[in-house]
Amino acid sequence: MPKRFTSKEERMVGLLMDMAMPRSLARTIVFFSKNEDCVCNHIQDVTDLRQPEVSTAMQYLKERGWIMTESLQQGRKGRPIISYKLAVPFDKMINTLIREEHAKIKDLRVKLNNLKQLTQ
């Protein structure tokens, strides 16, 4: 039986989703808090996501430069298995997300102040 998320990990997922992050991406990011490398099936088992959801999340993480991929060929037949590995430490990923959210908040405050000034 695959290990599921702890209550702490589920809270992390909830907080990421509160920041308007898609569920699949939030669950995949939290998965990497305890796993530095894996294959898609392992992510699916632990996060309770389907393969297309995992693939979409992994594409985002790869575009950000947060993971590396490696194709593992199993013999001569069949599709290769993709192995994923963190390219940056998990805490760096989270700190980047926090900085981005702080920047959004700062930008929103400026816009709200501008709106307030225009209405006075």
Q: What is the role of each PLM region?
A:
Residues 15-24, 39, 72-94:
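Short, cationic-aromatic polyanion-contact patches
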Residues 42-46, 61:
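A short acidic, leucine-rich amphipathic alpha-helix
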Residues 26, 52-53:
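Key DNA-contact positions within bacterial/archaeal DNA-binding proteins
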Residues 30-35:
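Short amphipathic alpha-helical elements of helix-turn-helix/winged-helix folds
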